[in-house]
Amino acid sequence: MKLLRSLLLIICCVHPVWAGITLNATRVIYNEKAKDASITINASGENRPYLVQSWLENSERNNEPAPFVITPPLFKLMANTTWQIRITKISESLPRDRESLFWLSIKAIPASDSTERNRMLIATKSVLKLIWRPETLDAAGASDAVKQVTATSNGQILTLHNPTPYVINIGAMRVN
């Protein structure tokens, strides 16, 4: 009973948050034939601007620069507006026989007002997959790639093997 009362009190005291930054995608696929790739950022809710910073990292997340440039890498996003980040390839060093994975990070920092007291503002960071798809690969092959993935079990360890040139996301998996 005490637990139920505590949960009810917490639920009643929590105020919903209707403001923030939203992105129009959960991943970006950059086709080699395209001039660039883009993602749209939307600021909604409160009348508060955001400072938005974006950058790319390679799949190993080491300090090696990604062969792309993001424009703009840093900008002010006003309340209730939409902005587009463009990703452009600047190097020919990418493999042409398989997809390549990079991480697109987008950090949004809300503006603070000196007149506001006792208010917590939280910066958010979204990390999305940027998948480089060379011209030799097509979307139809990507949807068939999951059929070629094999799984092997060694006790408590399940290992998946992807022999395809495609990056595969696993949303759900069932093991019998």
Q: What annotation goes with each model-predicted range?
A:
Residues 44, 57-59, 82, 88-92, ...:
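Solvent-exposed coil/turn segments that connect beta secondary-structure elements
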Residues 41-46, 156-164:
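Asparagine-centered strand-capping/turn motif at beta-strand->loop junctions
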Residues 14-16:
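N-terminal signal peptide c-region/cleavage motif recognized by signal peptidases
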Residues 45-62, 164-176:
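Short acidic, flexible loop segments centered on an aromatic residue
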Residues 62-94, 176:
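Intrinsically disordered, low-complexity Pro/Gly/Ser/Thr-rich segments with frequent PxxP/GP/PP motifs
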